[in-house]
């Protein structure tokens, strides 16, 4: 998954091929095909890998789930990976069901309307960032994150 992620991050979604991933991983294409019989299977594996990594990072936080979600969701330290992954998913919209299922589980963690609003706002900010739209002026970023964290506090 790291090799596929690196190809996608470095060269963009269009460059993600089984050949490029095998080269990056230093394995034969046949070896890669044993684990991922198609590009779609590779994309699914990469998606599941990153969703799981996000959940594990939240799980390591000492904060309650929703507060950790807001903190983790407001930052994409992946160097453009999520933009590229989004582009790849456009080719395989059936894989969005994986994201929908995870999102349902995550949103179910919200115990109040305010907490849910904080999560939805976090997702909106993340999506705006994916599209390269700056919706929060830099001087207000901390204040907005602070307010979302206040909303995320469970009663």
Which sequence ranges carry the predicted segments?
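Short, flexible helix-adjacent loops and helix caps
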Residues: 13, 59, 130-134
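Helical hydrophobic small-molecule/effector-binding pocket
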Residues: 56-97, 108, 112-113
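Hydrophobic/aromatic-rich alpha-helical bundle segments in the mid-to-C-terminal region
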Residues: 93-155
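Gly/Ser/Thr-rich helix-start
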Residues: 31-32, 46, 125
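Hydrophobic alpha-helical segments
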Residues: 1, 22, 27-28, 112-115, ...
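Alpha-helical structural segments
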Residues: 2-6, 10, 24, 41-72, ...
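Helix-turn-helix
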Residues: 6-41
